[in-house]
Amino acid sequence: MAMSFEWPWQYRFPPFFTLQPNVDTRQKQLAAWCSLVLSFCRLHKQSSMTVMEAQESPLFNNVKLQRKLPVESIQIVLEELRKKGNLEWLDKNKSSFLIMWRRPEEWGKLIYQWVSRSGQNNSVFTLYELTSGEDTEEEEFHGLDEATLLRALQALQQEHKAEIITVSDGRGVKFF
């Protein structure tokens, strides 16, 4: 059941692909770009990307309008997402990044709610069971990439709700 993506009205507006010089207009434009990136990545369950992939993806490249957001502007949008806690650079050159349409704390909260709701406190899970197991198929965190999952579990560990452990076939987590 693939859902289609609903592009915002701005995406069909050519000036959207040029960052505006007016401070107020630019802030609204950056907010719209950030919202678009997060919605797009969430729908496509895309959690990491390079800047070059981003530039060529439909996200920043409207083929129909023949407009593309310049790479310098993409960097500004990505930096705005980083400031909001939704992006983490994966290298010093800032050429690849982890996109988090939910912050790690939010993922942790969702996972912990599922654990509590299903009566599985004091249980141990492998990372695979959490993101790929049959029990989590209906959960939003099903299919979550390992890097984001670990950040979510680290957030829970800081709240003393979980402990990341080593199990025979890799890493796991015990929930309290």
Swiss-Prot record:
In terms of Pfam families, this protein maps to: ESCRT-II
Could you tell me the superkingdom of the organism this chain comes from?
A: Eukaryota
Q: What GO cellular component term, any one, is given?
A: endosome membrane
InterPro entries per the record? ESCRT-II_cplx_Vps25-sub, ESCRT-II_cplx_Vps25-sub_N, WH-like_DNA-bd_sf, WH_DNA-bd_sf
Tell me which Gene3D superfamilies the record gives.
Winged helix' DNA-binding domain. Chain C. Domain 1 (1.10.10.570), Winged helix-like DNA-binding domain superfamily/Winged helix DNA-binding domain (1.10.10.10)
Record localization:
Cytoplasm; Endosome membrane; Nucleus
Q: Which SUPFAM superfamilies match?
A: Winged helix' DNA-binding domain
GO terms (BP aspect): protein transport to vacuole involved in ubiquitin-dependent protein catabolic process via the multivesicular body sorting pathway
Keyword annotations = Cytoplasm, Endosome, Membrane, Nucleus, Protein transport, Transcription, Transcription regulation, Transport
Q: Which GO terms of the molecular function aspect are on file?
A: protein homodimerization activity; structural molecule activity
* Record flagged with keyword rRNA processing: no
Q: Does the keyword Membrane apply?
A: yes
How does this chain assemble?
Component of a complex at least composed of ELL, SNF8/EAP30, VPS25/EAP20 and VPS36/EAP45. Component of the endosomal sorting complex required for transport II (ESCRT-II), composed of SNF8, VPS36 and 2 copies of VPS25. Interacts with CFTR; the interaction requires misfolded CFTR. Interacts (via C-terminal half) with the ESCRT-III subunit CHMP6 (via N-terminal half).
PANTHER family, per this entry?
A: VACUOLAR PROTEIN SORTING-ASSOCIATED PROTEIN VPS25, VACUOLAR PROTEIN-SORTING-ASSOCIATED PROTEIN 25
Family indicated by similarity: Belongs to the VPS25 family.
> What job does the chain carry out?
Component of the ESCRT-II complex (endosomal sorting complex required for transport II), which is required for multivesicular body (MVB) formation and sorting of endosomal cargo proteins into MVBs. The MVB pathway mediates delivery of transmembrane proteins into the lumen of the lysosome for degradation. The ESCRT-II complex is probably involved in the recruitment of the ESCRT-III complex. The ESCRT-II complex may also play a role in transcription regulation, possibly via its interaction with ELL.
Descriptive protein name? Vacuolar protein-sorting-associated protein 25
This protein's species is: Rattus norvegicus
Tell me the gene name: Vps25
